[in-house]
């Protein structure tokens, strides 16, 4: 259910702005999106898991705040990240 270290490293390498970048908004949003996708799959089989559902809502909220910050500070980076992750269909 959680992200493996290899998958997390791949996400960081794919979305990092420079080498060693693990904290930029792009990297954080990519990791959160992966965790949200994993939890969404979990809820397809465990519909009554309300404790995890609360965690999912917190993750979605955190991702929304990061995306809002990125949109305010650099709209071009925001647009490229949205397209790369496939958000806003």
From Swiss-Prot:
GO CC terms: cytosolic small ribosomal subunit
Keywords of this entry: Ribonucleoprotein, Ribosomal protein, RNA-binding, rRNA-binding
GO biological process, one term: translation
Pfam families linked to this entry: Ribosomal_S15 (PF00312)
Domain of life of the source: Bacteria
Keyword NAD tagged: no
GO molecular function: rRNA binding; structural constituent of ribosome
HAMAP family: Ribosomal_uS15_B (MF_01343_B)
Cross-referenced PANTHER family: RIBOSOMAL PROTEIN S15, BACTERIAL AND ORGANELLAR (PTHR23321), SMALL RIBOSOMAL SUBUNIT PROTEIN US15M (PTHR23321:SF26)
Function: One of the primary rRNA binding proteins, it binds directly to 16S rRNA where it helps nucleate assembly of the platform of the 30S subunit by binding and bridging several RNA helices of the 16S rRNA.
Family assignment from sequence similarity: Belongs to the universal ribosomal protein uS15 family.
Subunit comment: Part of the 30S ribosomal subunit. Forms a bridge to the 50S subunit in the 70S ribosome, contacting the 23S rRNA.
Protein's UniProt name: Small ribosomal subunit protein uS15
Organism: Caulobacter vibrioides (strain NA1000 / CB15N) (Caulobacter crescentus)
């Amino acid at each position: 259910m959680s992200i493996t270290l290899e998958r997390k490293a791949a996400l960081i390498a794919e979305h990092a702005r420079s080498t060693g970048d693990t904290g930029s908004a792009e990297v954080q949003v990519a990791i959160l999106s992966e965790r949200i996708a994993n939890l969404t799959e979990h809820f397809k089989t465990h519909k009554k898991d309300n404790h995890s559902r609360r965690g999912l809502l917190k993750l979605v909220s955190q991702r929304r705040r990061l995306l809002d910050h990125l949109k305010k500070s650099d709209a071009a980076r925001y647009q490229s990240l949205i397209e790369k992750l496939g958000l806003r269909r």
